[in-house]
Every structure is written in C-alpha cells, then in structure tokens.
Amino acid sequence: MKIMRKNHPMLKIINHSFIDLPTPSNISSWWNFGSLLGICLMIQILTGLFLAMHYTSDTATAFSSVVHICRDVNYGWLIRYLHANGASMFFICLFIHVGRGIYYGSYVLSETWNIGIILLLTTMATAFVGYVLPWGQMSLWGATVITNLLSAIPYIGNTLVEWIWGGFSVDKATLTRFFAFHFILPFIITAFVLVHLLFLHETGSNNPSGLNSDSDKIPFHPYYTIKDLLGILLLLMTLIILALFFPDALGDPDNYTPANPLNTPAHIKPEWYFLFAYAILRSIPNKLGGVLALILSILILATFPLLNTSKQHGLIFRPISQTIYWTFVANLLVLTWIGGQPVEYPFTMIGQIASIFYFTIIIILMPVSNTIENNIMKF
C-alpha cells in the first residue's frame, strides 16, 4: 500500500497533499478551521443537492415547495435545517479562519491570501442568492434592496439592475437565475479551494511562532488528521444541536411569511453574517458612498500584505498590535449588532463611529503600531 501510495499517479498527489505533507510541528487548533471549512462545503453541497431535487424556482410555487420539503419529504425538514444552519457554521469558521490569518500574519503568503479573499466574496455571493430562494418576505425584500444598490453606479446603474432582475422588479426571472447561480457557485468555490491549497502547499503553512519551520516538520497524517477529526466532531455536534433544537435561532421570522411585493417588512436586514457589512453600508447617507464602503469593507483585506511594515511575523510577541487586533474584533461585533437594529438614533450614530473605526484600525492604527514596535525592539 505504501509503494502504491507513493508511486500511483493519482494517489501520489493525494499523498503529497494530505498524508506525507510536511507540516510545522507547533500549529495550534486555530489551524483546524481550514479543514472545517472543507467539511462545511461538503455538507452544503450534499444537503443542497437533495434540496434542489424537490425545490421549484418559480415565484408561484417556491415557498410551497420549501413547505413541501419540510412536511412531506423524508427527513426534508432535517436536510433543510442542516443546510440553513450549515451556512451559519460555514461563516463562523470563515471569519475565524480570516481572523487567525490576520493574527498570525498569514497574509504574507499573498497568493494564498488573495485567493482566500476571492473565496470569501464568492461564498458571500452564494449565501446571498441562496437566501432569496425560499421566497419569503425577507427573501424578496432583501434581494430588492441589495440588487438595487447597483443602481448607484453612474450611467449604467439602472440598466444593470434591470438586467440582473430580468425585468422591472424582482420576479420569476430573478428567482430562476438566482437558483442557477446558487447551484453553480459552490462548484466554482470548490475549484478556488483547490487553487487555494495549491498555493498554500507551494510555500508551506505558517505557524504560531512566525518563525521559519523548515527544520521542524512532521507528516500531516496521523498527527493532524486526528487533530482535525476532533474539530470535525465538535463542528458536527454543534451543527446537529443547532438544527435539531434551535433550527430558527439564526433565521428571520419574516421569512416564514410568503413574499408579498405590496407589503414591506418593518426592518429589512440580511442574514446575521452580513450584518457588519450592512451596518457599514447604512452608516453612509450617500448611496454610491455606501456601496463603495460595503465593497471596501471586504476588499480592504487585500491591503494587509501591503500595509504590513512589522519586522516580526504575526502578533504573538507584539502586545500593542494585539490590543488593536482585539479592539478590531470587538468593533466587528458592534457592527454586527448595529446591522440588525432599526435605522434610528442612537444606532445610526454608533454605526457611523464603528464604521470609521473599522477602516481607521486597518489603514492607520495597525501600520502605526507596527512602526512603534519596530522602534521599541530596535529593528
């Protein structure tokens, strides 16, 4: 078996990627989230495939088909809730994965980092079009509000919105194409994941100390396969508890009302994992400015390799940068909370302050703290 694993053309690739892969001996549990994201993606594709077998992408029957899945299909309710809550677990793992990358300076592996940003954007797009499919109130109005933002683009905005809608409002054509996008995007994500891994294995993994670990590597299997297995079991346990006991904890009650274009919900808001970006969008009174801030809130991650001036790798030995990092995390949680609140005082004011702080921390405070720490350490 060992000879076959090392010589067979197909098994050799798998062997070099998952079995005999040289891995730093000191990587912590924060490095588990890459494999957890892979498991989340597999769960989403499998449950999504079974849901697609029973779903109809027509405005007249979409809501009823989801009800049919929950009531009449064998374990349809379980598949639906695993898929809906699986998306939340996916984003929790995704945010922690990005957060770990920032904390431990993984952004210096710029190719892997940039593919990761593309993956984040593609996953957000997939989740957005997926939220429209049940055709509840929040599905319709969320799709209307978010797609309407494109009308802020000068000259071509309105034409672009109508082109995406396939008409003059979010209707049957929009739902059909969103279903097509939601079906194909996970496979595009899978392709990007392979490219992400390809670039990662070119350079090798980062590690908590931030030092070169070429002199101290161990094989990925069995050491990290066992470690990942524990993470996978904890993830599955959390997901199953969520799907069985609290299936609607992270959803919106408005989405249990069939879509009605004549009745606007009191508070239109996206799923919880988009609330931080939604708060940044709402904090700017100008429509185009809000859209640009929304896009920049994600694309600003690409500036990390450019703004990094520290002579040390990661934040593990840098207390000033650590303080700024955890302030940034707290600020993100504030933005997430504000995104779910109504547009009124004091929430608008808090949102504006938190949005300014979000960009200030990344563009000004982090590079300044790098320079201060370099001077203290006399680098």
Swiss-Prot record:
GO molecular function (one): metal ion binding
Main location group: mitochondrion
Gene3D superfamilies in alphabetical order: Cytochrome Bc1 Complex, Chain C
PROSITE patterns registered for this protein in UniProt: CYTB_CTER, CYTB_NTER
Pfam families: Cytochrom_B_C, Cytochrome_B
A GO CC term attached to the entry: respiratory chain complex III
Subcellular location: Mitochondrion inner membrane
Record-listed heme b b566 binding positions: 97, 196
InterPro entries to which the protein is assigned, alphabetical: Cyt_b/b6_C (IPR005798), Cyt_b/b6_C_sf (IPR036150), Cyt_b/b6_N (IPR005797), Cytb/b6-like_sf (IPR027387), Cytochrome_b (IPR030689), Cytochrome_b_C_euk/bac (IPR048260), Cytochrome_b_N_euk/bac (IPR048259), Di-haem_cyt_TM (IPR016174)
UniProt keyword annotation of ATP-binding present: no
One GO BP: mitochondrial electron transport, ubiquinol to cytochrome c
Transport among keywords: yes
Cofactor note: Binds 2 heme b groups non-covalently.
Binding positions (a ubiquinone): 201
Binding site for heme b b562: 83, 182
UniProt membrane topology term: Multi-pass membrane protein
Assembly and binders: The cytochrome bc1 complex contains 11 subunits: 3 respiratory subunits (MT-CYB, CYC1 and UQCRFS1), 2 core proteins (UQCRC1 and UQCRC2) and 6 low-molecular weight proteins (UQCRH/QCR6, UQCRB/QCR7, UQCRQ/QCR8, UQCR10/QCR9, UQCR11/QCR10 and a cleavage product of UQCRFS1). This cytochrome bc1 complex then forms a dimer.
Record's miscellaneous remark: Heme 1 (or BL or b562) is low-potential and absorbs at about 562 nm, and heme 2 (or BH or b566) is high-potential and absorbs at about 566 nm.
Name of this protein: Cytochrome b
Source species: Thalpomys cerradensis
Top-level taxonomy: Eukaryota, Metazoa, Chordata, Craniata, Vertebrata
